[in-house]
């Protein structure tokens, strides 16, 4: 059986175990065969394994005659923007929100994550194990000006946004946004309070960032609004002036209304996933906005956006795509767009967020085993019975970890807990 290397967000694993320098070198060679004698832009987050993987994948690419432009530490959306500007391929070495021992390889082309068909083409070459011999050898060059190009592009997008006097708190997750976020907010006039801005590769996402938003909610002192990013900068979660966490669903709801009022919300449509909270769906419906759902993963959100013509979509986790700003989830751009909506309305973030219901939702991870099956009659009965009583049940394999995720949503938290435990017992039996 052919090995599946790519998950929902590139290749990912624990460095030295499921993700090695040898694999990265081969990915470089496989991608190099597809690229030909072009160039590939490479960026990374702050993980300690980033240097080693960067060297390995660069060696694979240059051995196939491809020039490699090294950006150093830079958010995933920044690399995506650079590949769009230069019409080239890109590689980001990052495991996004995962702990420091993980790392990953994301492949981009012309601003977008590569499609499943191209991932399959790379996997096929990895499985075959034999690569073309090229007479031309590529070069590795520093491309640190890529950071300035990205910052310049973001500032141009928000040239009319004046944040003078605004107090903003940022949690940079000790990750890639340490190179961009503070500078952009300060340039726009904000007074910035920063947490977790170390580039020590052992601290990324550790008790901080978008997967631990309570850290910022508890620690921010001066901010009227806070933003907490993940390790590679493609997610953001907000914190309001009352120190309440504002999740991705609520951010999407606020942006949807703001864009609609400006006449910028295409087809009055927003794209979410099967995990999008029903409270957001009900709120959008009241505002005359349609919600389309798709599979979990920002690549699938983007596919549905392109298919439907929507220009706003995202996930509860904070992956939010504003297509007339960026071709991928960009935490910094999302944060600035939210600030723009707040400034334009004159309202507080808490006032907006409270308007959007957030129905109780519990997610539990169950370690996946070979004998575990989702095609189970008892499981089907539980789901059908729960659904008939108004609960929404989603059971799916994670695209980035060896677990099955159980999510149940409804209006009675105690009943949700019972349903989650019942499903867990069936899966583990």
UniProtKB/Swiss-Prot annotation:
<dbReference type="Pfam" id="PF00408">
    <property type="entry name" value="PGM_PMM_IV"/>
</dbReference>
<dbReference type="Pfam" id="PF02878">
    <property type="entry name" value="PGM_PMM_I"/>
</dbReference>
<protein>
    <recommendedName>
        <fullName>Phosphoglucosamine mutase</fullName>
        <ecNumber>5.4.2.10</ecNumber>
    </recommendedName>
</protein>
<dbReference type="GO" id="GO:0008966">
    <property type="term" value="F:phosphoglucosamine mutase activity"/>
</dbReference>
<dbReference type="InterPro" id="IPR036900">
    <property type="entry name" value="A-D-PHexomutase_C_sf"/>
</dbReference>
<feature type="binding site" description="via phosphate group">
    <location>
        <position position="96"/>
    </location>
    <ligand>
        <name>Mg(2+)</name>
    </ligand>
</feature>
<comment type="similarity">
    <text>Belongs to the phosphohexose mutase family.</text>
</comment>
<feature type="active site" description="Phosphoserine intermediate">
    <location>
        <position position="96"/>
    </location>
</feature>
<keyword id="KW-0479">Metal-binding</keyword>
<keyword id="KW-0460">Magnesium</keyword>
<dbReference type="Pfam" id="PF02879">
    <property type="entry name" value="PGM_PMM_II"/>
</dbReference>
<dbReference type="InterPro" id="IPR005843">
    <property type="entry name" value="A-D-PHexomutase_C"/>
</dbReference>
<dbReference type="GO" id="GO:0000287">
    <property type="term" value="F:magnesium ion binding"/>
</dbReference>
<dbReference type="GO" id="GO:0005975">
    <property type="term" value="P:carbohydrate metabolic process"/>
</dbReference>
<dbReference type="GO" id="GO:0005829">
    <property type="term" value="C:cytosol"/>
</dbReference>
<dbReference type="InterPro" id="IPR005841">
    <property type="entry name" value="Alpha-D-phosphohexomutase_SF"/>
</dbReference>
<feature type="binding site">
    <location>
        <position position="234"/>
    </location>
    <ligand>
        <name>Mg(2+)</name>
    </ligand>
</feature>
<feature type="modified residue" description="Phosphoserine">
    <location>
        <position position="96"/>
    </location>
</feature>
<dbReference type="InterPro" id="IPR016066">
    <property type="entry name" value="A-D-PHexomutase_CS"/>
</dbReference>
<keyword id="KW-0413">Isomerase</keyword>
<feature type="binding site">
    <location>
        <position position="230"/>
    </location>
    <ligand>
        <name>Mg(2+)</name>
    </ligand>
</feature>
<dbReference type="InterPro" id="IPR016055">
    <property type="entry name" value="A-D-PHexomutase_a/b/a-I/II/III"/>
</dbReference>
<dbReference type="Pfam" id="PF02880">
    <property type="entry name" value="PGM_PMM_III"/>
</dbReference>
<comment type="function">
    <text>Catalyzes the conversion of glucosamine-6-phosphate to glucosamine-1-phosphate.</text>
</comment>
<dbReference type="InterPro" id="IPR006352">
    <property type="entry name" value="GlmM_bact"/>
</dbReference>
<keyword id="KW-0597">Phosphoprotein</keyword>
<dbReference type="GO" id="GO:0006048">
    <property type="term" value="P:UDP-N-acetylglucosamine biosynthetic process"/>
</dbReference>
<feature type="binding site">
    <location>
        <position position="232"/>
    </location>
    <ligand>
        <name>Mg(2+)</name>
    </ligand>
</feature>
<dbReference type="GO" id="GO:0009252">
    <property type="term" value="P:peptidoglycan biosynthetic process"/>
</dbReference>
<dbReference type="InterPro" id="IPR005845">
    <property type="entry name" value="A-D-PHexomutase_a/b/a-II"/>
</dbReference>
<dbReference type="InterPro" id="IPR005844">
    <property type="entry name" value="A-D-PHexomutase_a/b/a-I"/>
</dbReference>
<dbReference type="InterPro" id="IPR050060">
    <property type="entry name" value="Phosphoglucosamine_mutase"/>
</dbReference>
<dbReference type="GO" id="GO:0004615">
    <property type="term" value="F:phosphomannomutase activity"/>
</dbReference>
<dbReference type="InterPro" id="IPR005846">
    <property type="entry name" value="A-D-PHexomutase_a/b/a-III"/>
</dbReference>
């Amino acid at each position: 059986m052919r090995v599946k290397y790519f998950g929902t967000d590139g290749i990912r694993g624990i460095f030295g175990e499921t993700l090695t320098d040898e694999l990265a070198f081969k990915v470089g060679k496989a991608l190099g065969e597809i690229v030909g004698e072009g160039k590939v832009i490479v960026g990374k987050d702050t993980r300690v394994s980033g240097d080693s993987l960067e060297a390995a994948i660069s060696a694979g690419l240059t051995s196939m005659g491809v020039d490699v432009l090294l950006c150093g530490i830079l958010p995933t959306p920044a690399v995506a923007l650079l590949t769009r500007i230069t019409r080239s391929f890109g590689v980001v070495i990052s495991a996004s929100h995962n702990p420091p021992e993980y790392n990953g390889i994301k492949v981009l082309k012309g601003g977008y994550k590569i499609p499943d068909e191209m991932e399959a083409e790379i996997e096929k070459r990895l499985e075959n194990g034999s690569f073309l011999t090229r007479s031309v050898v590529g070069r590795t060059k520093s491309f640190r000006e890529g950071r300035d190009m990205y910052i310049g592009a973001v500032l141009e997008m928000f040239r009319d946004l004046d944040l003078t006097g605004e107090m903003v708190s940022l949690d940079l997750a000790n990750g890639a946004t340490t190179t961009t976020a503070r500078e952009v907010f300060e340039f726009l006039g904000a007074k910035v309070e920063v947490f977790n801005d170390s580039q020590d590769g052992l601290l990324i996402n550790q008790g901080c960032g978008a997967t631990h938003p309570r850290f910022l909610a508890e620690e921010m002192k001066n901010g009227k609004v806070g933003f907490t990013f993940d390790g590679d900068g493609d997610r953001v979660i907000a914190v309001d002036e009352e120190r309440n966490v504002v999740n991705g669903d609520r951010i999407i709801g606020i942006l949807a209304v703001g864009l609609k009022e400006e006449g910028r919300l295409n087809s009055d449509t927003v794209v979410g996933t099967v995990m999008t909270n029903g409270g957001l769906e009900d709120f959008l419906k009241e505002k005359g906005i349609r919600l389309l759902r798709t599979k979990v993963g920002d690549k699938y959100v983007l596919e549905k956006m392109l298919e439907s013509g929507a220009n706003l979509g995202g996930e509860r986790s904070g992956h939010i795509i504003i297509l007339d700003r960026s071709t991928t989830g960009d935490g910094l751009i999302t944060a600035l767009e939210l600030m723009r909506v707040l400034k334009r309305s004159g309202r507080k973030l808490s006032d907006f967020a409270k308007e959007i219901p957030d129905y109780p939702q519990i997610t539990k991870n169950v370690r996946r085993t070979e004998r575990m099956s989702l095609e189970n009659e008892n499981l089907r009965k539980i789901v059908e019975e729960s659904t008939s009583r108004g609960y929404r049940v989603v059971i799916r394999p994670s695209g980035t970890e060896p677990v099955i995720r159980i999510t149940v949503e409804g209006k009675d938290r105690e009943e949700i807990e019972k349903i989650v435990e019942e499903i867990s017992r069936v899966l583990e039996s």
